[in-house]
Amino acid sequence: LKVDSFLNHQIDVSFVCELGKEFYRLFKDENITKILTIEASGIGIACLTAQYFNVPVVFAKKTKTINIYSDTYNATVHSYTHKRDYDIVVSKDFLNKDDNVLIIDDFLAKGSALTALLMLIEKAGAKTAGAGIVIEKAYQGGGNLVRDMGIRVESLAKIKSISKKDGIVFCKQ
């Protein structure tokens, strides 16, 4: 599924602003205090969404760098794309028990990144308002996994299947 020309390599800012408006419409009554994403391709979407909520964006880093001096919340993500596990970190300075967090990301497939972000929120003692996903690969099960945990997941596009024969088949919303 190639979306790199407008979403996660080159960004069509006008389009992503519209995504942000839609996430705001869906979650505006949730009293969001922070938007959380994971580097790298979720950052642009999260930032343009955050402008409508007027809240900061926190992104989980895939490596702990020397400029993160404070204690951190940590979780492990399995990347099916890169076929490896990696740790993600968020400074305890930027996520705490008073936060009501909206997770924003470009894709949801098997749910590994999303469940790791949920772990960071839980470790901080914060509340999860939900997750806004641009494209959910419903056939990989991550969305149902997270919904079964009681988390509200709003996907702007849900793909039922992808095949050479039928192309991309979207779920009926």
Protein language model regions, located:
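PRPP-associated nucleotide enzymes
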Residues: L1-I104, L108-Q173
